Amino acid sequence: QRLNINDNHPDLSVDQKKHILKKLNQAVSFESFLHTKYVGQKRFSLEGGESLIPAIDSLILAADDLGVEEFVMGMAHRGRLSTLANIFGKSTKDIFSEFDGKDYDDEVFDGDVKYHMGWTSKIDPNKDGKKINISLAPNPSHLETVGAVVQGIARAKLENNYSSDTSKVLPILVHGDAAIAGQGLAYEIVQMAKLKGYATGGTIHIVVNNQIGFTTNYLDARTSTYCTDIGKVTLSPVMHVNADDVEAVVHAVLFALSYRMKFKDRKSVV
């Protein structure tokens, strides 16, 4: 029934479209500045996948309206700096200082590279006076490692703070196409999603598919047709959308959220 509304096309208000454009512009401007100012420095750009920023932003806005109080997010290095700046509110001054090689005291800084850093913020996404907690777990260059950590953090928050009410905590995982298809840990997390001892009420997985894994063409990286075929293991809903169509990306993310919040069958949504 939901898919039949408006022929499954985005039905966004003018204000929503303007906000999406604002977040997209922030993502593009951020990457453009880094490319101009810090030529040749590693930053693992989100260029080509900037629609991730308005997608996550729209997800948080909508989930806040549905009563979610905490977001626990994990992602690899691709696009992390833009996410820190444009979603989590990390100061761009601090990010640029890391590019400039600013020294930090050992007591307050773990010495890891800038695109591995985590962050925790309290934000008021809908400007209604209600603040929510959003956390991005730190992640090394070991792809998909953070996925299990995010599930553990979410499960602990559910049990300790919300009497296991899965509508209050939302885990979000962002993957690359090569990593979700090639790393065994991703499969293990999916298989544990509905087990009583590990369930978190369902995780929303977002795959940024740039069709390459380091230097490996996707045709040489997996046997399955799609990198997201791992979701079929548990019959989880899987949606494919063109990242160049930002409104369609937002539409897909909001559908994933609605499914997760309505059915609470502890499945993932990809």
Model-identified regions with their sequence ranges:
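Conserved internal helical-beta-strand scaffold that buttresses enzyme catalytic cores
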Residues: 1-172, 178-186, 190-204, 209, ...
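A broad detector of short, well-ordered amphipathic alpha-helices
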Residues: 61, 229, 250-254
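Conserved thiamine diphosphate
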Residues: 127, 226-249
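Hydrophobic/aromatic ligand-binding patch that stacks against planar heteroaromatic rings
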Residues: 195, 230, 259
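Active-site capping/gating regions of soluble enzymes
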Residues: 216, 239-265
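Conserved small/polar residues in nucleotide/adenosyl-binding loops
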Residues: 269
